[in-house]
Amino acid sequence: MLLSDKDIRAEIDAGRVRIDPYDPSMVQPSSIDVRLDRYFRVFENHRYPHIDPAVEQPDLTRTVEPEGDEAFILHPGEFVLASTYEVISLPDDLASRLEGKSSLGRLGLVTHSTAGFIDPGFSGHVTLELSNLATLPIKLWPGMKIGQLCLFKLTSSAEFPYGSERYESRYQGQRGPTASRSFQNFHRTQV
């Protein structure tokens, strides 16, 4: 069940959903807007001949931060990691989906490539996978609205929520845009 604005506010007021910093004006009819932080992870395309999700490649990305009040420029065809300004914390019986903002999508900005789902129990900044599909560069201003979180009520609490010992939960508590840790639990079935 998708939560309405009334239900979102009630979950935040009860302390079950934490959004820090919280701005009540960001609550929409069935979502809550999130803003862009000021840190970006850009890919160092010359460090490796290819990306291998089975292998740790620590120099694949590096963190950059725009100076002062400057924007980050995302060029056509470019892909970078960023994160929400807000820290998001979910209880064991709510999951979330990060969706892009329609107005930004109409400019060619993709907010997340594939990983828009946030498990119950997650706590941290949400990493964004930003791509520019437009033919012109896009200015990304730290603090601008970048997406919206939709909250979903589970039929029951997760038995093993994100952050529990059963799962490695390698992104729990992440700060800023976090590089892929796919090598930590890489699985391949012989076919």
Curated annotation (Swiss-Prot):
Site feature: Important for bifunctional activity: G116, F117
Binding sites annotated in the UniProt record for dCTP: K101, S102, S103, L104, G105, R106, D119, T127, L128, E129, Q148, Y162, Q174
Hydrolase among keywords: yes
Keyword Mitochondrion among UniProt keywords: no
Top-level EC class: hydrolase
Swiss-Prot/TrEMBL catalytic activity: dCTP + 2 H2O = dUMP + NH4(+) + diphosphate
UniProt keyword list: Hydrolase, Nucleotide metabolism, Nucleotide-binding
UniProt EC number: 3.5.4.30
Region (Disordered): 169-191
GO molecular-function terms, A-Z: dCTP deaminase (dUMP-forming) activity; dCTP deaminase activity; nucleotide binding
Positions of disulphide bridges: none
HAMAP family to which the protein is assigned, alphabetical: dCTP_deaminase
The protein's name: dCTP deaminase, dUMP-forming
Name of the coding gene: dcd
